[in-house]
Amino acid sequence: ETDLLLDDSLVSLFGNRR
């Protein structure tokens, strides 16, 4: 169940790119 952790990381990066 590390999908959430990975998602968080991606979201952080994507959010920054936004």
UniProtKB/Swiss-Prot annotation:
Its EC number is 1.11.1.24. Keywords: Antioxidant, Cytoplasm, Mitochondrion, Oxidoreductase, Peroxidase, Peroxisome, Phosphoprotein, Redox-active center. Residues 1-18 form the Thioredoxin domain. It catalyses: a hydroperoxide + [thioredoxin]-dithiol = an alcohol + [thioredoxin]-disulfide + H2O. It is found in: Mitochondrion; Cytoplasm; Peroxisome matrix. The modification Phosphoserine is found at S12. One of its GO terms (cellular component) is mitochondrion. GO terms for molecular function: thioredoxin-dependent peroxiredoxin activity. It comes from the Eukaryota. Monomer. Thiol-specific peroxidase that catalyzes the reduction of hydrogen peroxide and organic hydroperoxides to water and alcohols, respectively. Plays a role in cell protection against oxidative stress by detoxifying peroxides and as sensor of hydrogen peroxide-mediated signaling events. Belongs to the peroxiredoxin family. Prx5 subfamily. The active site is a conserved redox-active cysteine residue, the peroxidatic cysteine (C(P)), which makes the nucleophilic attack on the peroxide substrate. The peroxide oxidizes the C(P)-SH to cysteine sulfenic acid (C(P)-SOH), which then reacts with another cysteine residue, the resolving cysteine (C(R)), to form a disulfide bridge. The disulfide is subsequently reduced by an appropriate electron donor to complete the catalytic cycle. In this atypical 2-Cys Prx, C(R) is present in the same subunit to form an intramolecular disulfide. The disulfide is subsequently reduced by thioredoxin. This is Peroxiredoxin-5, mitochondrial.
